[in-house]
Structure formats: structure tokens, C-alpha cells
Amino acid sequence: MAAATAAAAAAAAAGEGMEPRALQYEQTLMYGRYTQELGAFAKEEAARIRLGGPEPWKGSPSARATPELLEYGQSRCARCRICSVRCHKFLVSRVGEDWIFLVLLGLLMALVSWAMDYAIAVCLQAQQWMSRGLNTNILLQYLAWVTYPVVLITFSAGFTQILAPQAVGSGIPEMKTILRGVVLKEYLTLKTFVAKVIGLTCALGSGMPLGKEGPFVHIASMCAALLSKFLSLFGGIYEHESRNTEMLAAACAVGVGCCFAAPIGGVLFSIEVTSTFFAVRNYWRGFFAATFSAFIFRVLAVWNRDEETITALFKTRFRLDFPFDLQELPAFAVIGIASGFGGALFVYLNRKIVQVMRKQKTINRFLMRKRLLFPALVTLLISTLTFPPGFGQFMAGQLSQKETLVTLFDNRTWVRQGLVEDLELPSTSQAWSPPRANVFLTLVIFILMKFWMSALATTIPVPCGAFMPVFVIGAAFGRLVGESMAAWFPDGIHTDSSTYRIVPGGYAVVGAAALAGAVTHTVSTAVIVFELTGQIAHILPVMIAVILANAVAQSLQPSLYDSIIRIKKLPYLPELGWGRHQQYRVRVEDIMVRDVPHVALSCTFRDLRLALHRTKGRMLALVESPESMILLGSIERSQVVALLGAQLSPARRRQHMQKLRKAQLSPPSDQESPPSSETSIRFQVNTEDSGFSGAHGQTHKPLKPALKRGPSNSTSLQEGTTGNMESAGIALRSLFCGSPPLEATSELEKSESCDKRKLKRVRISLASDSDPEAEMSPEEILEWEEQQLDEPVNFSDCKIDPAPFQLVERTSLHKTHTIFSLLGVDHAYVTSIGRLIGIVTLKELRKAIEGSVTAQGVKVRPPLASFRDSATSSSDTETTEVHALWGPRSRHGLPREGTPSDSDDKCQ
């Protein structure tokens, strides 16, 4: 059937005298390029022979130069041309291929990550060097210990605020919003990239409890966006929004992969924290780029002689034959449950700190004027508490985060029955056993102090994350449980034939994964831990603890990233709660807004102005008439404002005055003499044609798509927006304000005294050919505008979306949430057999979900559910009335948006 159709099409084309061309539709149904082109050539040739047409290669040179037929030529010139064309296409296509893009992205991010780690290590070593060099003078040592991080944090905050304030914070909440379809201006630009990299390096080099993973997701996304712009020079495929979204999803995985050298965990973590629904076709992009980036990152460490070979970032040496006993599983479960409560408390504390600072208006205004004072004070407080000769000796204050993790993951036991073992521990491990305290007290103080310090430090307006501080706190908590188990079982766990000692380092690994998973609401932290440590021996305890921690934390608080989204008031859609069966009984008709801002197809400009005053939304519904409410499409607010501005523009008013002057100066023929009174002039002005196109004869022309119009419409709109602003002041104030301001009132009062003089000037200008422009009094302008507002609207001069997203009133809340999450829409119209009855936005959906989640165990019936029974009884009558609306519909012409190809793409 397909072959017959193709042959018939080729025959018809040949019969009409058209040049032979390849059938693109048929090409998608065959294997291989050569077979495909040969088949198309054979079918066209058969059609030509059957109809007796001329041979194409004996025709014009253009026919012989057809690309599809060049390879059948025998001349050397044709073969050279074929080779050059193929080489050009190969180079362009290969440079634009995904794997080239992903290799470049992974390489750049690995270089950035390694360079930042090197700079951070140098900064931390400088702080330690100054502290050790001044150990003879405690005051100078304290000043050096405190001043160094204060200077770095202050520089980071100031540099970020000056160059790009969008670089502040983690970046994962914003990327989650961007991947959902929201556009954040100046968030993926080059200056934001520079501010993020330099600011993050200074912030982490200060030694504050800040993280790197979240900002690196943002850095990788910016790198992908900039790389897409560069590669768009070779091929336009990267200019498409869908392709950019796919590359951003892969970039999020690269950010985690090159940060921890954990490609598998990076891909899974990026999916969990940024996506609700993930396209599986992007899986290979994320894994390929993350793996390549992690490989280059570790190769650079070997090249710099930091490592002997490619190994894990925090290599451990746990027992592989018997890593844990069955009797230890309850302890691992306790770690998971406690980490769940701890993660929820961390998110709550972080949010409360921000809310308290915002509610204190006096402090907030003072700190807003002194933007660098808050980060300096917080850094001063934390540095003072971590000063090693002072209180910092009881919380291992002299250790960096990397050194802390290395000591916490140590597989040797630090204590036996509460006392330090006589073992040759590394110098870093000695920091956990100060002279006047034991390991337990040091770990408890470390956990408590680092907990609130990390929650406070992550609120500093610098590029920073919270994953690494939480990871360290969880490792310390797990180490505390492990050391407690080692003290309770000093001889180890007895089995049938042997005894196995407790490994506290394994408990630290479990605690780190559990607390990090509880704060971020992810399970992939378990995989990240396996790749960080290089061992998978504790896979079962880690998975048990992470799952339990997630179960507890998700029932108490949102994730840290969702909490930041709410704090920053970004558009978000909360997840449906667990075990809330009443949300399946809530329908769209229970939560929708019934008073929908709309405009009718036959409305006037006055109706448009009223619709703009009623709502601040971005879209307005377009209906057939206020009686039928048949939804025809949606129109953007900017389009409506452009229509009103063009209708009341000074250029249009000058055009009417010029017509009026020509009518006054033209000699009367078979008509009465032109009136000279003021009222007659106003009558003539009001009776001029006031259609939007400016000419009376254009009102009956067929409607034209907005994207195919000539420059005349855009020129008139530009003149209307860039004309004389002083003469348009009254029009704009009457359009957007209920009453004129005091300055306008005083100007009107002053102009009343010279109205007669202005009217005389108008009459003189009407009788003179040398005056280029006539003037109108404010009263005449207002009267003219009132007349213009009563004119019908011609929607052919604006872009209309003929297929806005729609729902039916019986759609469940669960299904609506799934649709909004999957498609990334922010509003949907509710229709009943084509009739507009309501609208649902993210605000209504969010309120409904949060209301069902926070219900106090009582199954409350939806507020409008009581009307369903009565509505069901009258459904037949309602259906009959709605069907009756389709009969007497007036045949209005509805303009379409864009070209037919655009609408076809939308249908697909």
C-alpha cells in the first residue's frame, strides 16, 4: 500500500512537470541510506518511463546536480563533489553529536573540579600553617585563625553580590525549577559561572562547614548551557529547548560525578533531586558524561601525585569475609531511624533560621544595608568556637572535612571500655581524644555543634551546599554508635566457631549515608557511599538505614531542596502524601477557580481593559461569547496590552487628526459647508473610522496569521509604543489606573485655563497647510479614547494559542498532579464539553495537596463533594443545553498561531 501510494505520488508529480525529488515520507520506512535512495530513484524513474517524460540527466544542469542523483554519475567531477559534500556533512554532524558534547562537558567539569580542589587545599594548608607558626602566642594565633576565614567569606559574599547574585546558594533547587520548565533569567550565564566558581572556592577554602556538591550541579548546568551556545555555531540542534533540557539533565549528573568521583551515584542522585519523571533516553547521556568526568578527575589526581593510582576518594579497608554480624542489624536500624529524625530537624532548623531573620524587620533592614556584615559575623562565631586551643579541642576543630571523614571511616577501634587504646593511631585520629575528655564526649560535642553550625552556615549568602556537612555529621553519629557497640562488646560478637570484632568505621559509613539521605530525601546516597569508600561490603546495612531514614524524614519535613524552593518562593508542586486516601476522592471541580478571567471573540477594547484589571495572570482565556463560554483558545497578557496600546496610541490619534484636517481643507462638493464650531469638530473626529488596522477597507479582509504579517503592523505598534509619551500620558493613566494621579490632576487643572487658546490653535492649524500636526485638548483626548474603547477588537493582529491545556471537571487530584508533573504545565482550563467552567493553577493544586497531607487523621469530605449527587441528576439536562450551543454559533473567524507546520508540530 505504501509503495503504491509513493508511485502514485511520483506519477502525479511527473505529470505536473515537477522536478523529481526524494520522498521523505517513504524514507522512514526502509533500511539503510543506499537502499533508500536507490528505491526512491527507481520509483521516480518508473513513473517517468510510464508517463513518457524526458530523462532527468539529459535536462538542465540543475537536474543533474540533484544531491540524491549525484552518486549515479560517472564523471570524476561528480565524485569529487560527492566526497566534499559527504565530508562536510560528516564533520558538521559529528561536531554536533551528543557524544562530542558530553565528552567536552565531562572534560571541562573534571578540570574545574580538580582545580578547585587544589585551590581549596592550598587555602586550608595556609590556615594550618599560620596557626602552627603562631602557636607561641595564643592571641596572635586566635587572630590569624579567625581573620583568615572572615576575609575569605567576606570576599566571596561581596564578589558574588557584585558580579552575579544568582550564584548564591546551592543551585539544586533552581535547577529543579528550570528542568520543570520555568525560566530563571541570568541563571545560566557566563558571569554567574565565574561568580559561582570563585565564590565557592573562597567559601570552601575558609574551612566553614559548607558543601560542594549542590553548587557543582549548578556549575555543570551553566557549563552545559554555555557549551550548547558554542556548539550551536556548528549545528542548530542545540538551539532547541528540548535538546537543552536533555543536556541540562546530563549536566546535573556530571556535577555530582566529578565532585565525588561517583558516576553511578551521581546519575541516580541527580535524577532523584531534580526530576519527578525522568526520560530513560537520557540515561546513557548521564552515565557517559559522569563516567568520563569522574575518570578524568581521578587521573588528574594521579598526575599531580596525590594518588598512586585511580582509587576511591575515601578508601576504606573493612573486612570482606565477615563485615558484620546479624546481631548488629538492630543497631544499623537504630542509626537509620535516628538519622531520619535528625534530617527532619536539620531541615526545620535551617528554615526557621531564615524565617526568624526575615520576621525581624529591624535586623533585616540593617543587614540588607550592610550585606557583608551577616556572613562576617557568622564566620567569626563559628571560627571562634572551632579555635583548636580553645573550645575547638573538644570537637576536633583543627581537622578539615576531608581529614574528618578519613578518621571517621577508620576501621580500627578507638576505645575499649571507654578508654583510648594503646595503638599507634595517626596524628589526625589523636584529635578525637583530647587530654581532658574521651572519645564519646568529643563525638557528642562534635555532632551537636556541627549540627547547628552547618544549619546556620548554609544561610550565608555565598555559593555553598549542605550535602558534605550533613554527610560528615552522619558519619560522626555512626562512629559514635560503632564505638558504643565496641565498648559494650569489647571481645566482639561471638559466633559458633569464632569471634568477630566490631568495626566502627562501618557504622560511620551507614550513618553518613542515612543522614544525607534523610536531608535530601534520596536513596542514591547509598550508592554514592559505596563509590566513595570503594567497598560494597556493608550494602545491606546501608540500604536498611537509608530506607528507614527516608521513611521517617519524608513523613515529617520536605527535603532540604524543596524547603529552599519554598523559602525562595519558586514555583513548585509538592509531592502527594503517604497513606492519604482522601486525595483520591478529590476532583478538579472541588479545587478549581470558577471565576475565570476571559475575553470574548466579539468583545470591545473596554472589555479587554476590564479583563486586565481583574487579573494579573499571564494568560487570558478566549471564549466564543459570554453566553456560550465555548473555549476557543488562550491569549497572552502582553498581546492584550499591545492591542490596547496600539488602539490608543498617539500615532493613531495623529492619524485621525490628519484625516480631520484634510476633510476640513478639502472643498465641499454636493455637501454642506464644513462646520466651524467646536462641537462639530468633535463630531467629525468621533465619526472617523477607528478600526485597529487604521483603514476602513481592511476590516473585511481575511484574517492573517500573526507570524506571516508584513512590517506594517509591527511598525504601527512600534510607533504606538515609542511615540510622544507626554501626549500619551492621559491614555495610559486611564488604561492602567482607576483615577489619575495628583500630578495629572494638577496638569489638567492648569490646562483648563488655556483650553480656548488651544482650541483656537487647532482651528488655525486646520486651515493652514504648514502646520505638521494638529493638537487636541485633554477633554477631546478623553472623549476620543472613550470612543476607541467601544470599538470591537480585531484578534487577527495577535497570537492566539488555539489548543490550551484542558481538563474535565471529574479528573481526580492524583491524576491532575501526575499530569502537571509530567508535562510541566502551570495552569489548565477546566471544560465541560467544550464550555469553560474553571481554571486550575499550581496555587490551587498546591493548596489541595498540602491540605490533604496535613489533615489530622480525619477523613474530611471535599467541600464541593456534596453537590455531586445533585449534579449527577442534572447531567442529562446540562449535556442537552451544551449541545444546543453548537447549533446557533456565529461563524467567527479564529486566527491561528504561527504557520500550519507549527500547528502540526503541536499536534504531534
Curated annotation (Swiss-Prot):
Known regulation of its activity is:
Common gate kinetics are down-regulated by intracellular ATP. Inhibited by AK-42, a derivative of meclofenamate. Inhibited by Cd(2+). Inhibited by Zn(2+) and PKC activation. Inhibited at acidic pH. CCLN2:HEPACAM channel conductance is up-regulated upon hypo-osmolarity.
Biased-composition ranges, Basic residues, are: 653-662, 698-707
The reactions it catalyses are: chloride(in) = chloride(out); thiocyanate(in) = thiocyanate(out); bromide(in) = bromide(out); nitrate(in) = nitrate(out)
* Span list, region Disordered: 653-722, 866-908
Please state every residue range assigned to the domain named CBS. Answer: 592-650, 800-860
Swiss-Prot/TrEMBL keywords: CBS domain, Cell membrane, Cell projection, Chloride, Chloride channel, Ion channel, Ion transport, Membrane, Phosphoprotein, Postsynaptic cell membrane, Repeat, Synapse, Transmembrane, Transmembrane helix, Transport, Voltage-gated channel
Stretches the record annotates as Modulates channel gating by both voltage and cell volume: 44-57
Residues on the Cytoplasmic side? 1-95, 557-908
Task: Give the record's subunit note.
Answer: Homodimer. Interacts with auxiliary subunit HEPACAM.
| Stated name of the protein | Chloride channel protein 2
